[in-house]
Amino acid sequence: MGMTSDTIADLLTRIRNALKAEHLYVDLEHSKMREAIVKILKQHGFLAHYLIKEEHRKRTMRIFLQYTNDRKPVIRQLKRVSKPSRRVYVPAAKIPYVFGNMGISVLSTSQGVLDGSTARAKNIGGELLCLVW
């Protein structure tokens, strides 16, 4: 697929496909934004862990996927909200609660990439990047 114009959608698609294929991990090009999103997913138990590798001045990320004891993906759904063609911004009060609060929203804010509950607590809105549950 190469570098698409929407690296976040690409990240979510690659994770989705890897989970469908029951892969242990997925490798992709590193970016600060991608790492920030992956870090939040890991903090919330949606991903096992990740590594950043540097080879020939190229940084790649290896994301280790998380499965339940009976080998089902922990992530049910990854949904891109804001897109390069149609940006979606929300104030703190409009940050969605996801999947009966078992899921998370990820926002790009003036204070960096945050999960919805953190942004809500800080009373800051931002660009609604994606929903995960």
From Swiss-Prot:
Q: Known InterPro entries for this protein? A: Ribosomal_uS8, Ribosomal_uS8_CS, Ribosomal_uS8_sf
Matching HAMAP family: Ribosomal_uS8_B
The parts of the chain that form a coiled coil are: none
Instruction: Tell me which family the UniProt entry assigns to this protein.
Output: Belongs to the universal ribosomal protein uS8 family.
Q: Which gene encodes it?
A: rpsH
* Described purpose of this protein according to its UniProt entry: One of the primary rRNA binding proteins, it binds directly to 16S rRNA central domain where it helps coordinate assembly of the platform of the 30S subunit.
Asked if rRNA-binding is a keyword of the record, the answer is: yes
Q: Where are the transmembrane segments?
A: none
Keywords assigned by UniProt, alphabetized:
Ribonucleoprotein, Ribosomal protein, RNA-binding, rRNA-binding
> Can you name one GO molecular function term for this protein?
rRNA binding
Q: Describe the subunit structure.
A: Part of the 30S ribosomal subunit. Contacts proteins S5 and S12.
Q: What GO biological process, any one, is recorded here?
A: translation
**Name of the protein in question:** Small ribosomal subunit protein uS8
Q: Which GO terms describe its cellular component?
A: ribonucleoprotein complex; ribosome
